[in-house]
């Protein structure tokens, strides 16, 4: 759906599969030419595509007038979900999310792996990266800096870097060619309150998940998400708190 700056609706587009299929959009990005990119998933086959498995990743490009330019559907024989999308200065598109299988000949590390896929502006796939542990990982946000390095945030239940326990937030940096530059993993520890049945406090692991990432003009990286604990000396005020973490360009 598009509105102009005066809040007047310009157009509405609806992407439909078969009567028995389920489609969902999760991510949205706009390039320098005002083309629009939507990432999500489907359990059917769209635009003549055949479903690879249970759920497939979707990437759709529209022009500024709302005309569909192309649609890409891809996945493994299992569940694959596109959750975020962004565009670099050259019009290349990056999609992240998670897969329960292996994409483009890659092997799944465990339950769920993070993926990062790059397409050019014409919709031709350039490369696929897949990363995981024997447990669970998800990619929830993707950003691109002025040098076209790519940053992915999400979470892991395993050890990609230093493991704090439970679900840890992560941020990954890839260069333009898809080579991973570094991984940062961080989390908190939370405490269970005393109960009427057990008067001793118990330490438990915290669920910490990165959901969004952005880069400023100096190359600093900002990650936001939620935590059940207290990060870097902060005190948790309830069940889930918002966090904001800044990294330098490294």
Outline where the language-model segments fall.
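A sequence-level/structural motif corresponding to short, flexible coil/turn segments enriched
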Residues: 1-250
């Amino acid at each position: 759906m598009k509105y102009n700056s005066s809040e007047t609706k310009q157009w509405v587009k609806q992407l439909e599969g078969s009567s028995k299929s389920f489609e969902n959009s999760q991510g949205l990005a706009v390039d320098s030419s005002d083309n629009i990119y939507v990432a999500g998933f489907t359990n059917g086959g769209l635009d003549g595509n055949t479903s690879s498995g249970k759920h497939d990743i979707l990437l759709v490009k529209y022009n500024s007038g709302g005309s569909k330019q192309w649609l890409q559907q891809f996945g493994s024989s299992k569940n694959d979900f596109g959750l975020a999308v962004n565009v670099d200065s050259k019009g290349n598109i990056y999609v992240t999310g998670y897969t329960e299988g292996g994409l483009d000949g890659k092997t799944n590390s465990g339950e769920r792996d993070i993926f990062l896929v790059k397409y050019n502006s014409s919709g031709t796939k350039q490369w696929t990266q897949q990363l995981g542990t024997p447990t669970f990982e998800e990619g929830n946000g993707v950003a691109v800096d002025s040098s076209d390095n790519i940053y992915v945030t999400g979470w892991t239940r395993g050890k990609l870097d230093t493991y704090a326990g439970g679900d840890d937030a992560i941020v990954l940096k890839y260069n333009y060619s898809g080579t991973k530059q570094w991984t940062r993993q961080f989390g908190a520890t939370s405490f269970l309150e005393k109960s009427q049945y057990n008067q001793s406090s118990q330490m438990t692991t915290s669920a910490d998940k990165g959901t969004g990432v952005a880069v400023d003009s100096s190359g600093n990286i900002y990650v936001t998400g939620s935590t059940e604990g207290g990060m870097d000396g902060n005190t948790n005020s309830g069940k889930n708190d918002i966090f904001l973490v800044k990294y330098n360009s490294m």
